[in-house]
Regions:
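Extracellular/periplasmic helix-exit of transmembrane alpha-helices
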Residues: 77-89, 231-241, 259-288
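Small/aliphatic-rich secondary-structure junction motif
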Residues: 483-537, 541
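Juxtamembrane transmembrane-helix boundary signature
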Residues: 41, 68-101, 110-116, 316
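Glycine-rich, Arg-bearing micro-motifs that act as flexible, cationic patches
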Residues: 592-615
């Protein structure tokens, strides 16, 4: 169609406003109706990448970095609350808000950075699941990495059952992880006084790299995009009171879900500190941690729970990572592809480097990749946090829901902490690279240094007040567009007839519209068999003759109601022929039936409707 529908402008259109909020019920039932989005977000805070940084932090520095986890969790609650408020109040997710408020080139760069972060997160999920399969079933890591490519189908099946079923599915994984680590804490018998001392802030140059990794693993940039879209699955009353209630319930949901994630992360770090640091063991990979748990704790049950929790973490993060990728691509680019294909693409990007590194460095390379993936996430974080903070503090975007002054100050303190830690890490890393590069340092000066400076300038730009830069357009229209009072008239209407679609309904709608508008009606059917594909109009096979007789019979029946009906056969590919026939006969409207493909059928056969709709500049009425 030539115009964009309202559905194409919303986040996750398949589930947008699909969950009803009951009225005149108790507080608990209303809270449960809003519960869910934060739990989908929370699994990203306990994915395998967190395990790598938490394990190394606990094994190398004991309980010393617990305060970093606490700070990261508080920052996460604050930022995720901002993201939820943005989605509830404006009806726009963070990616759409960036597209609305920044020039296209800046939006494209922000999109690329976000895609890199999602790929880094997916890399952690691939490696985590593969390691879990290796620990549980003794599969080689490379085989495990390849197997993770097939979890795309799991996502596809779960998504088709609706957002509430998906939330329940994820909650099961969260519960499994929580139970496993509660048992691990019981087995490890930590020093609780030492745990309490870990909440006192202190940081050394050696622990900075791990601290930034923990920050990147705990506060994940793509989760901000995800949360701002997921809250729109609820049918929130579009009044100030309704939005305020939704913001309160989502704050409660976020606090509970992210504190559950904090418990899991804290349990991993405490487990590593009480088992490995206490025994003077330096853990360099997850497999090593798994192997040491049984002899050190005196039970094989500890190792089994560890592997089960790791697989659960990887698989639950897979689902939410795909949703985030879909939101980012649609929000920044207005480009929509099937989620399952999006999953294949993202997973392929993650699998390739994993296979290469494991092939070259062996199983030990997987742990290095996990740590690196979390640092990449942390470095991308400011490019999501600062726009979010600016949008939610802007009264022209949020109206009466804009952040209060003290909340804005807290937000900027969190943003400055993130930027300062990242800047320190980047400067130290580049300095070390140059110092160890020798004669090749020149290439670092002309590639890496300019890239880092460009990123710094981009960050300054997105942080600038809107009065210093031109906004592309407001997040919502400032005035209602003029609507023509002249009724739409259709002179020529086409109906696409297919044995596999609801033919009776298509004909009923086409007949009704043709009668109402006194329009000429064309009946189209495309011969898809071998004869039609190879010989086109020259085909005279039994299928073509039967199709011709079928169309003539329908046309004769419709003519009895006084309509001018013309049956037309097409030959070859359905989409190409329907577009050609519609243009040849100068249609004003095309009526089609939906196939209703589900699951794998829709992936492999595709949708004729979507392809025809994008090729034609006329309205297309889809009948199911």
């Amino acid at each position: 169609m030539s115009t964009q529908t309202e559905e194409s402008q919303v986040s996750l259109s398949e589930v947008h406003r699909s969950v009803a909020i009951p009225r005149n019920v108790g507080l608990l039932k209303r809270m449960l109706a809003f519960a869910g989005p934060a739990y989908l977000v929370s699994v990203g805070y306990m994915d395998p990448g967190n395990w790598a940084t938490d394990l190394e932090g606990g094994a190398r520095f004991g309980y010393q970095l617990i305060w970093v986890l606490l700070m990261s969790n508080l920052i996460a609650v604050l930022l995720q609350t901002f993201a939820a408020r943005l989605g509830i109040v404006t009806g726009r997710d963070l990616a759409q808000a960036c597209r609305d408020n920044y020039p296209k080139p800046v939006g494209y760069v922000l999109w690329v950075l976000c895609e890199i972060a999602i790929a880094a997160c997916d890399l952690a999920e691939v490696l985590g699941t593969a390691i879990g399969l290796n620990l549980l079933f003794h599969l080689p890591l490379i085989i495990g990495v390849i197997i993770t490519g097939f979890d795309t189908f799991v996502f596809f099946l779960v998504q088709n059952y609706g957002i509430r079923r998906m939330e329940a599915f994820i909650l099961v994984f969260v519960g499994i992880i929580g139970v496993c680590f509660t048992a691990e804490l019981f087995f490890s018998k930590p020093d609780w006084m030492g745990v309490a001392g870990g909440f006192i802030p202190r940081l050394t140059p050696e622990s900075l790299y791990i601290a930034v990794g923990i920050l990147g693993a705990t506060v994940m940039p793509h989760n901000l995009y995800l949360h701002s879209a997921l809250v729109q699955t609820r049918m929130v009353e579009q009044t100030e009171e309704g939005k305020r209630a939704a913001c309160r319930f989502n704050l409660f949901d976020t606090a509970i879900a992210l504190n559950a994630a904090f418990f899991v992360n804290g349990a991993i770090l405490v487990l590593a500190a009480s088992v490995f640091f206490r025994n003077g063991l330096v853990v360099t990979e997850i497999q090593q941690a798994h192997g040491l748990l049984a002899p050190l704790l005196g039970t094989t049950f500890a190792s089994l729970l560890f592997a089960i929790a790791l697989i659960s973490a990887g698989q639950s993060s897979t689902l939410t990572g795909t949703l985030a990728g879909q939101i980012v691509m649609e929000g920044f680019l207005r480009f929509k592809i099937r989620p399952v294909l999006r999953r294949f693409l993202t997973r392929s990007i993650a699998i390739i480097p994993a296979v290469i590194v494991i092939s070259l460095q062996g199983d030990g390379g997987s742990y290095t990749l996990l740590i690196l993936s979390q640092v990449i996430l942390s470095l991308q974080l400011p490019f999501a946090v600062i726009p979010l903070l600016k949008f939610t503090s802007d009264k022209s975007i949020m109206g009466p829901f804009a952040n209060k002054a003290w909340v804005t100050v807290l937000g900027w303190i969190a943003a400055l902490v993130i930027v300062a830690l990242n800047a320190n890490l980047i400067v130290d890393t580049i300095r070390n690279w140059i110092a160890s590069a020798g004669p090749n340092a020149f290439w670092l000066w002309v590639t890496v240094v300019p890239f880092a400076l460009a990123c710094a300038f981009l960050l300054i730009y997105v942080a600038m007040p809107k009065s210093w830069r031109e906004r592309r357009r407001p997040a919502v229209p400032l005035q209602i567009p003029a609507i023509s009072k002249v009724p739409q008239h259709y002179s020529v209407i086409g109906a696409a007839i297919d044995y596999h679609t609801p033919t009776e309904k298509v004909l009923s709608h086409a007949q009704s519209l043709a009668s109402q508008h006194h329009a000429a009606l064309y009946l189209f059917h495309v011969v898809e068999g071998a004869g039609g594909l190879v010989y086109g109009k020259e085909t005279l096979d039994e299928e073509a003759r039967a199709d011709q007789e079928y169309l003539e019979a329908i046309a004769s029946e419709l003519r009895t109601s006084g309509l001018k009906v013309t049956p037309v056969l097409g030959y070859g590919r359905v989409t190409t022929e329907l577009v050609r026939l519609a243009k040849e006969h100068k249609l004003d409207l095309l009526v089609m039936g939906g196939h209703g493909h589900k699951y794998l059928a829709d992936l492999f056969f595709g949708t004729t409707i979507s392809k025809v709709r994008h090729e034609l500049g006329i309205p297309v009425l889809v009948v199911k």
